[in-house]
């Protein structure tokens, strides 16, 4: 994926971690878990997350975060998720995180 394409996706900041909200590489099993957590199918979850439904956004971030840390908890993500967690690449100084 090019750097310009990465700039199109929001980045969610939770503590000292950054998660690129690129839905294109979320697997079927991951979407199944998101549906189990939220009751929403993939398109509904994406739509709700884009409207800052924190249950949907938190579930997606949780799934992405689990790729790096199998011990991460959904409630820990939700407890640290707020409006200011949603950033663009221009707002951040560092590299674009990998999904």
Can you say where each PLM-predicted feature lies in the sequence?
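Charged interaction scaffolds used for protein-protein
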Residues: 1-20, 25-62, 66-99
């Amino acid at each position: 994926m090019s750097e310009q394409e990465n700039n199109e996706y929001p980045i969610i900041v939770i503590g000292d971690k950054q998660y690129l909200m690129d839905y294109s590489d979320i697997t079927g099993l991951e979407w199944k878990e998101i549906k189990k957590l939220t009751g929403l199918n993939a398109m509904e979850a994406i739509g709700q997350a884009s409207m800052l439904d924190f249950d949907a956004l938190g579930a997606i971030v949780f799934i992405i975060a689990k790729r790096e840390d199998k011990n991460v908890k959904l409630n820990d993500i939700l407890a640290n998720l707020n409006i200011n967690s949603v950033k663009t690449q221009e707002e951040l100084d560092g590299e674009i995180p990998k999904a």
